[in-house]
Swiss-Prot record:
GO cellular component terms listed in the entry, alphabetical order: cytosolic large ribosomal subunit
Superkingdom of origin: Archaea
Homology family: Belongs to the universal ribosomal protein uL30 family.
Protein name (record): Large ribosomal subunit protein uL30
CDD domains attached to this UniProt entry: Ribosomal_L7_archeal_euk
Species name: Thermococcus kodakarensis (strain ATCC BAA-918 / JCM 12380 / KOD1)
UniProt GO BP: maturation of LSU-rRNA from tricistronic rRNA transcript (SSU-rRNA, 5.8S rRNA, LSU-rRNA); translation
Alphabetical list of Pfam families matching this protein: Ribosomal_L30
InterPro entries given in the database record: Ribo_uL30_ferredoxin-like_sf, Ribosomal_uL30, Ribosomal_uL30_arc, Ribosomal_uL30_CS, Ribosomal_uL30_euk_arc, Ribosomal_uL30_ferredoxin-like
Subunit-structure text: Part of the 50S ribosomal subunit.
UniProt keyword terms in alphabetical order: Ribonucleoprotein, Ribosomal protein
An example molecular function term from Gene Ontology annotations: RNA binding
Amino acid sequence: MAKLALIRLRSGIRARGEVRDTLAMLRLHRINHLVIVDDTPSYRGMIQKVKDYITWGEIDKETLAKLLRKRGRLIGNKPITDEYVKEKLGMTIEEFAEKVVNGEMKLRDLPNIKPVFRLHPPRGGLKGSKKRSFKEGGALGYRGEKINELIERML
């Protein structure tokens, strides 16, 4: 089962109530926040509802490992370290990221991990308008594998 990375790009100021509720259920409370979810029909429906406020795509194991290493946080705002992952799970961050992407483990199998990753705005800016879809040359919507390039620029 593939893992999807969802990044919120737009504010919810003028959004309908159900869109704001769905963004809250996805834990995307602020702009430039990222969450990792399973590619299931229920999440697909939620993504479809908020497609005008987020961008998403399939994350690969290298990008997930970098994301965990650089932006992953534990409760108390402590960074995720190799020592912590080794102590709790008996593996490195790269091995954990590979198992998460392959569906063998979930992110929450690592105790005390925060489910949201707070990112910087992308270096070089978003390639296009925040009001148009990625297919039309904008920034929103489905990106596929190109989400990894955007995450790299936001780390």
